Amino acid sequence: MNLFADFENRIKTALETLDLVKEKRSELSFDRIVVEPPRDASHGDAATNAAMVLAKPLGVSPRVLADLIGEKLKEDADIAEVSVAGPGFLNIRLSVAYWQRLLANVIAGGTDFGRSQTGAGRKVNVEYVSANPTGPMHVGHCRGAVVGDALANLLAFAGYGVTKEYYINDAGSQIDVLARSVFLRYREALGEAVGEIPAGLYPGDYLIPVGEALAQEYGVRLHNMPEEQWMEIVKDRAIDAMMVMIREDLAALNVHHDLFYSERQLHANGAAAIRTAINDLTFKGHVYRGTLPPPKGQLPEDWEDREQTLFRSTEVGDDIDRPLIKSDGSYTYFAADVAYFKDKYDRGFDRMIYVLGADHGGYVKRLEAVAKAVSEGKAKLTVLLCQLVKLYRDGEPVKMSKRSGDFVTLRDVVEEVGRDSVRFMMLYRKSSEPLDFDFAKVTEQSKDNPVFYVQYAHARCMSIFRQAREAFGDIDLSPDVLEAAVTGITEPSEVQLIAKLAEYPRIIEASAQSMEPHRIAFYLYDLASSFHAHWNKGKDQPELRFVNDKNRQSSLARLGLVHAVASVLQSGLAITGTDAPQEMR
């Protein structure tokens, strides 16, 4: 049950009964009417702009219209009070009986409360991480991995048919460098003194086992092959080994993709997929032969002062036209991007989300141009950019040199502070804003550590259930029993907690629509704060305690509230990819 959608419908129904609305109904649009929590909770439980939106087309003042709407709403038994504020906003306070029914609805829904059908099963492809398969995941990949994964979880909960995809960049020049780096480690494993790793190769020790495995399997045979022969063998083995490492790193972060798509598929069979994509754009009039003027600043690697085959991307929103085929007949990296988008579109995705690092900001317009051209405007592409993560320890910048290279790996961070801390904190700021990650703060057991505070709220719920079983022994805490007891909830602070629970469906829909999974983390912290605050009131006010061993029925009512809080916490934590613990250790 979405409280705000429910009362938006009730307000629209009330409007339909007003004579002045009936007279001009064909001229009116209710689309801009919004019902939301008031900025100040003391003003009521819901607020609407209905009178402000419709006053001008109806030719009356907002306050007059608000009074008319308010009189109609007062006929609703679920509304305890209606008041007009400011220039014509309506504040609504709901009856205790309504809150009791809503609580019963949360209990019945369990962890499915808030699940939405907004997506209506529409297919969405979320591509994230897509790190080059040249080494272990570093902390720079971490934020995009978490944001992409949580966004995919959120969209699935909102009713979309989501595919989590990883694009393996295994066809570029970096793979040649990887193969040569591994071949050096292979020679080293055969006993050759290779000395210092040459500049331009990957120096990390993580390549040593790959070289050793090749030496064990092939002996000196690879060494005796011409480069064009051993290169393909080493490429295959190196990519496979790197992807095993990357999958393990992602699994440590509880990130699991549905599909790993190899760029080499696009280059197979004489690059048939790329050729087909370019032919398709040519047929649609988006391709021409020409020479690009030199761009200002540093020249991109695909620019050359010769005639090339170009994508007319400026006609579909890009800043410059983009090369597809170089003067020597080879395809550009961008040509593969076009083919990859077309492949997704041909797989039935008309909604695609790319989660990229902030350093890929220059790709946004060209990808959007590809989407418009390939799909003829039928597909929607969204690029989310994740800003940098800076590591600190007790406020001091972290500088760490690891055996895997001169960077902090994702695994380093997860092993030090735990998967849940990493995931939740990566979401505890909007992805477009830089994030400071302090190792000391994310392991504190205090209100200042959001992941601890939220998980502690769930663990506290579980502790209350254990306390109830100790107090009453055979007490039945099944949802049916707890639903039936909700009429015992009457205290204002209890109603405030239900009101916070009632926001969850709206948060889900709004977060999915704006593609902002961080809003789930913020909401969970607010809910945990409300729950902890209510629990603390029980210290001084025994009548508010969740378990009263002298009153089984009132305890059941409050245990229903605990069940509802635990369910929503568990649901939200699942979206963030974080555990809901039974107890804190």
Curated annotation (Swiss-Prot):
Its EC number is 6.1.1.19. Its main location: cytoplasm. One of its GO terms (molecular function) is arginine-tRNA ligase activity. It comes from the Bacteria. A motif ('HIGH' region) lies at residues 131-141. GO terms for biological process: arginyl-tRNA aminoacylation. Pfam families: Arg_tRNA_synt_N, DALR_1, tRNA-synt_1d. One of its GO terms (cellular component) is cytoplasm. It is an enzyme of class 6 (ligase). It is found in: Cytoplasm. The keyword Cytoplasm applies. InterPro entries: aa-tRNA-synth_I_CS (IPR001412), Arg-tRNA-ligase (IPR001278), Arg-tRNA-synth_N (IPR005148), Arg-tRNA-synth_N_sf (IPR036695), ArgRS_core (IPR035684), DALR_anticod-bd (IPR008909), Rossmann-like_a/b/a_fold (IPR014729), tRNAsynth_Ia_anticodon-bd (IPR009080). Belongs to the class-I aminoacyl-tRNA synthetase family. PANTHER family: ARGININE--TRNA LIGASE, CYTOPLASMIC, ARGINYL-TRNA SYNTHETASE. This is Arginine--tRNA ligase. It comes from Allorhizobium ampelinum (strain ATCC BAA-846 / DSM 112012 / S4) (Agrobacterium vitis (strain S4)).
